[in-house]
Amino acid sequence: MFSFEKNSLKNTDKEIFDAIELEVKRQHEHVELIASENYASPAVMEAQGSQLTNKYAEGYHGKRYYGGCEFVDIAEKLAIERAQQLFGVDYANVQPHSGSQANAAVYNAVLKPGDTVLGMDLGAGGHLTHGSKVNFSGKIYNSIQYGLDENGDIDYKQVAQLAKEHKPKMIIAGFSAFSGIINWQKFREIADSVDAVLMADIAHVAGLVAAGVYPNPFPYVYVATTTTHKTLRGPRGGLILCNNNPELAKKFQSAIFPGIQGGPLMHVIAAKAVAFKEALEPSFVDYQKQVLKNAKAMEKVLKQRGINIISGGTSNHLLLLDITNTGFSGKEAEAALGRANITVNKNSIPNDPRSPFVTSGLRIGSPAITTRGFKEKECELVANLLADVVFNCGDEKVENETAAKVLDLCDKFPVYK
């Protein structure tokens, strides 16, 4: 028999306990600017760390292949209903373990190996699962890639031209590092012109969409996929959404189970349900509005400091910075900022001459610092501190002085009180 006191993590595995404690310390002492990261609430983490992790539940609620699922059924049903309400759709599959799993299920549901897919190029801001040659999406399927125009917006003329030329079976509208707004209607018009399925990958902007501060892809898309963390502030996981298309919804059900997954992670699904409930609160709309304000505040300062922003600025939560003029690579800047207690990720920019392991850019975002309580004033300070370091990578004095300022700021805004 287990005892929660006797068999605590600290008593059972001191090495893992210490690693977690160090990560908790890092999260408190560093300003988190990685655009895909956020802080889950204590309620979300409590659900994810619950005894639901013990339960196997192959199948869907009400139709399981195991007994004893009556209570995990409650959790999954709540997660589905809340996701449907949040995004205004009549179908939601909450079982995908990740955004990539959700994307893979959609591929399996609507395509056959060798079918043509049109997605955003990784170097232009797309995701690996949008047809990158190193990913399943670029190996199993015939991947055609679109990019950005001279203004840093999606090149819709190119999308239309490529669609006409290659007749894709599916077009993906979505991104991993693009700071603009997607014109869902334009994509739908292009998709309809070649009889293609239009899929939206809203992993980065799902929270903004749910709050009504970023255009909703429905009714223009056939299906939307997303992660449940990032701007949604939930556990790490995936989600498939569909509306007014029961035939397609049925395909998505079987594409996840038994298609690419077995038992769902019921503790994660419960945590998703909690996150969706939190996102249905009016305060969540206020949060997303502040996310946008904070991103614009950083944009203003970074432009003043002479840092080039791809697409000329941001209309969402993230900024892709071209730091070529600093004389340092993205890899060097990421390391220097890390020493200064600012966490970012190096990122390729359009037509980047450097490899993806080095890069000429940085990707930053405002979701995590907004959750922390930062407003425009703090974000302007953070942007200035970032610029101080990026122009002086390797300068120990600048890095140490910045780290001290960051620690002072973080102490005023604890992540978990």
Swiss-Prot record:
Binding-site residues for (6S)-5,6,7,8-tetrahydrofolate, renumbered to this chain? 122, 126-128, 355-357
User: What cofactor does this protein call for?
Assistant: pyridoxal 5'-phosphate
User: Is the keyword Phosphoprotein assigned to this protein?
Assistant: no
Functional description taken from the UniProt entry? Catalyzes the reversible interconversion of serine and glycine with tetrahydrofolate (THF) serving as the one-carbon carrier. This reaction serves as the major source of one-carbon groups required for the biosynthesis of purines, thymidylate, methionine, and other important biomolecules. Also exhibits THF-independent aldolase activity toward beta-hydroxyamino acids, producing glycine and aldehydes, via a retro-aldol mechanism.
What is the protein name given in its UniProt record?
Serine hydroxymethyltransferase
User: A GO term (biological process) for this protein?
Assistant: glycine biosynthetic process from serine
Describe its assembly. Homodimer.
Q: Which source organism does the UniProt entry give?
A: Francisella tularensis subsp. tularensis (strain SCHU S4 / Schu 4)
Q: Where is this site: Plays an important role in substrate specificity?
A: 229
**Which chemical reaction does it catalyze?**
(6R)-5,10-methylene-5,6,7,8-tetrahydrofolate + glycine + H2O = (6S)-5,6,7,8-tetrahydrofolate + L-serine
Q: Which UniProt keywords apply?
A: Amino-acid biosynthesis, Cytoplasm, One-carbon metabolism, Pyridoxal phosphate, Transferase
Q: What is its EC number?
A: 2.1.2.1
Q: In which pathway does it act?
A: One-carbon metabolism; tetrahydrofolate interconversion; Amino-acid biosynthesis; glycine biosynthesis; glycine from L-serine: step 1/1
GO cellular component entries: cytosol
Spell out the SUPFAM superfamilies in the cross-references: PLP-dependent transferases
